[in-house]
Amino acid sequence: MPKVTVLDVRLYGEPVSTLTNLQDGRTIFAFNEAYIEDEKRPTLSLSLKDPFGALITKFRPYNMVVPPFFSNLLPEGPLRKYLADRAGVKPSREFLLLWMLGRDLPGAVTVHPSEGDDAPPDDEQAIVEARPNALRFSLAGVQLKFSAFKNDKKGGGLTIPAEGTGGSWIVKLPSQQYSGVPENEFAMMTIARMMGMDVPELQLVDLDAVSGLPQGVGELHGQALAIKRFDRTPEGAVHIEDFAQVFGVFPDHKYDKGNYRMIGRVLGIETSTADVAEFIRRLVFSTLIGNGDMHLKNWSLIYPDRRTPALSPAYDLLSTIPYIEGEDTAALNFSRTKKMAALSKDELAHLAAKAELSEKLVIDTARETVERFRAVWEAEKKNLPMAAKVADTIDTHAPTVELYREFAK
């Protein structure tokens, strides 16, 4: 067994850094000298810059895990366990999982075995054989989802590639625990688009129109949700990072190591006024529909010019309250509170002050969002393919939010 295994990290196909796994389980990250010296280098992560914008070049080793930026590229929870079980390894072995999945990760980053180092840390046949199928699960997150190609000339539908690499669509399968989740998300994302938010192209598809599903996904009912990937274009991959990566925290802390005020602060410093307004729209909308799962990984930055961040298009907008009785807390604190009902003009003013955002921009955007929601929701809720329980729950919940009542006056 080799004492050291090295993975090359590439950004837009160009080498930028290495991850070195030592025999004692430590992983060491280091930038390449050429990347450090390149004044026009593409941005890998805001978390790898100091408060003055300079590149950080010294990092501590991580024991038994990879650094947070890379840990957040890997699947979580049951999906990670499924992959690890198939490969015969422990779910905690992140370096090995990154070796398996690194050719098709979110954004424009890829991870490859260093030249002459094609074997994984433990050169086991089961791991080598599991790698091609594992790539089909290379999207980060908990929900069962795959990257897929759309069949424009073959009667429609989508195909999950046999070895997982490529694909400009995401297919999210029905939940085995909660009914109608794809339909719920389709409806909420559609409402958001009608309200003027930046939402990618999406559609509901019958399960029999999705080819290439791997074995072991279980018995599924309902439709799947297909979403066009905003990190893939005809010109190639576009780099993205979620806010767990931005803040340098591991996925396990996506609910407790940040808040919406902190996200707003980053957007105010790094992006545009339009992006700050879009952030407030999504935050208010998510509160009105009862989305209690907008944690750090459900907000992302995108790098259209490879260097400058912008708020990415919206994703994972759905109403969670129909599935969790009595749920009335957001995934993160707004500024002082997590209670959805307590989101008010005063709470947003506090958020704006602490995040150093324009209070007028924040409050005016919130008012406009509430007004648009009331109009669009009332006009469209019966035209969308969500369960009656979802619509009824939102009808009951939205008026409990203080902002909703304040702007109704």
From Swiss-Prot:
Membrane-spanning intervals of the chain: none
InterPro entries: HipA-like_C, HipA_N1, HipA_Ser/Thr_kinase
UniProt keyword list: Kinase, Plasmid, Transferase
A GO CC annotation given for this chain: cytosol
A UniProt-annotated Pfam family: Couple_hipA
EC number: 2.-.-.-
Enzyme class of the recorded protein, top EC level: transferase
Molecular function via GO: protein serine/threonine kinase activity
Active site: 293
Similarity remark: Belongs to the HipA Ser/Thr kinase family.
Protein name: Putative kinase Y4dM
Organism from which the protein derives: Sinorhizobium fredii (strain NBRC 101917 / NGR234)
